[in-house]
Amino acid sequence: MPSETQSQTSKAKLWVSYIVSAIPVLFLVSCGIAKLVQPAPVLQGFAQIGFAQSLVVRLGILELICTAVYLIPRTSVLGAILLTGYLGGATVTHLRVSDPKFVAPVILGVFIWGGLFFRESRLRALIPLKRD
C-alpha cells in the first residue's frame, strides 16, 4: 500500500502534468480551429511561408486529430509522437523562410513530452532523469 507521501507525490505529478499539457493543447486547438475558420492573418501567414491556401484546412484537421489522439489517455504516447512529427515540420518550415518563430514549435514539443513524462510512469522508466 502506498504511503501518504507517495500518493501526494503522485497527485502532485498528475496535476503538474495536466497544467504542463494544457499549455500546448490550448495553443494547438486554437491554431487548428483558426486553420479551419481561415481568417485573413492565417491565410497571410501561409502565403508568407510559401504554402498553398488549399493546405490550410488539411493541416488544421491534421493538427486537431493529432491533438485529440494526445488527449486520450490510452493513445497519449502515440499522440505525442504524431505531434512531434507535426511540430518538427512546423519548425523546419519556419527555418526555411528564416522566421524567428521557429522556436515556438520546439517549446510546444517540450511541453507535450514534459506533461506526458509527469503522468506516464512507463515513459519515466524509459527516460530516467536520475540514476538510482
Range-by-range predicted roles:
Residues 27, 39-40, 62-64, 86:
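A generic alpha-helix surface/boundary motif
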Residues 22, 36-38, 68:
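Short low-complexity stretches enriched in small and charged residues
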Residues 1-30, 72-132:
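Extended, low-polarity transmembrane helix blocks
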Residues 30-55:
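Solvent-exposed, well-ordered loop and adjacent helix/strand elements within mature globular domains
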Residues 30, 51-71, 78, 110:
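Core segments of alpha-helical transmembrane spans in multipass integral membrane proteins
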